[in-house]
UniProtKB/Swiss-Prot annotation:
The gene is eIF4E1. GO terms for biological process: defense response to virus; regulation of translation; response to virus; translational initiation. MRNA binds at residues 80-85, 112, 130-131, 180-185, 225-229. Induction: (Microbial infection) Induced upon infection by soybean mosaic virus (SMV) in susceptible plants (e.g. cv. Tianlong 1) but not in resistant plants (e.g. cv. Kefeng 1). It comes from Glycine max (Soybean). Disruption phenotype: (Microbial infection) Increased resistance to potyvirus such as soybean mosaic virus (SMV), bean common mosaic virus (BCMV) and watermelon mosaic virus (WMV), but susceptible to bean pod mottle virus (BPMV). The keyword Transmembrane helix does not apply. EIF4F is a multi-subunit complex, the composition of which varies with external and internal environmental conditions. It is composed of at least EIF4A, EIF4E and EIF4G. EIF4E is also known to interact with other partners. In higher plants two isoforms of EIF4F have been identified, named isoform EIF4F and isoform EIF(iso)4F. Isoform EIF4F has subunits p220 and p26, whereas isoform EIF(iso)4F has subunits p82 and p28. Residues 47-58 have a biased composition (Low complexity). This is Eukaryotic translation initiation factor 4E-1.
């Protein structure tokens, strides 16, 4: 698989910073999360994972073509009255292969996140919101997975994006994994929804990278804003 050729081997296990987990008595602190902290659900409902790349990773870095930012939508801070996207926070921005693996190996993967969590990875300075000017005229491809079974597909999606494996990578804004009670969803957001050739190419390549056999659909953000769940797929592959 092409995305498995990424340079993970340049980082050895002893270079990863150890995961920092807080005590379980901090359930009320989710709204005060610092940059780099992600709450988890279940027995360790008050736990957080904090990531800061060690100084050792600054040696001989392998730069990525683009810088990327992880964002987290904290389910504990959401309310029905809050505006959509108001609880999304930037977690960490990375620009090298080493920084990516340092962060990825020290944050909770989708199967460990609480219900309702949304975890994003977007190109730096693009916010994962419909209102962002770069996203405004775009749309998204979406894949679905059984609850707790999206970890590997999420990783391969990230590797394909940051490794610039897509022929129309300039069209990609980022990706998000949504953790819900019945299923997990992974979506790739793009810039120009009306560019059918580029969107179809991205959808087909994404399925190939993940060896995903089900049909996937592309929805325009504009339709999603107007129709919510009633929005129809404009493209399918």
């Amino acid at each position: 698989m092409v995305v498995e050729d990424t340079q993970k081997s340049v980082i050895t296990e002893d270079q990863y910073p150890s995961r920092v987990v807080s005590d379980n008595n901090n359930d009320d602190d989710d709204d005060d999360l610092e940059e780099g902290e992600i709450p988890v659900d279940g027995e360790d409902s008050g736990a957080t994972a904090t990531t800061k790349p060690p100084a050792a990773l600054a040696r001989n870095p392998h730069p990525l073509e683009n810088s990327w930012t992880f964002w987290f939508d904290n389910p504990s801070s959401k309310s029905k009255q809050a505006a959509w996207g108001s609880s999304i926070r930037p977690i960490y921005t990375f620009a090298t292969v080493e920084e990516f693996w340092s962060i990825y190996n020290n944050i909770h993967h989708p199967s460990k996140l609480g219900l309702g969590a949304d975890f994003h990875c977007f190109k730096h300075k693009i916010e994962p919101k419909w209102e962002d000017p770069i996203c405004a005229n775009g749309g998204k491809w979406t894949m679905t997975f059984p609850r707790g079974k999206s970890d590997t597909s999420w990783l391969y999606t990230l590797l394909a994006m940051i490794g610039e494996q897509f022929d129309h990578g300039d069209e990609i804004c980022g990706a998000v994994v949504n953790v819900r009670s019945r299923q997990d969803k992974i979506a790739i957001w793009t810039k120009n929804a009306s560019n059918e050739a580029a969107q179809v190419s991205i959808g087909k390549q994404w399925k190939e990278f993940l060896d995903y056999n089900d049909t996937i659909g592309f929805i325009f953000h504009e339709d999603a804003k107007k129709l919510d769940r009633g929005a129809k797929n404009k493209y399918v592959v």
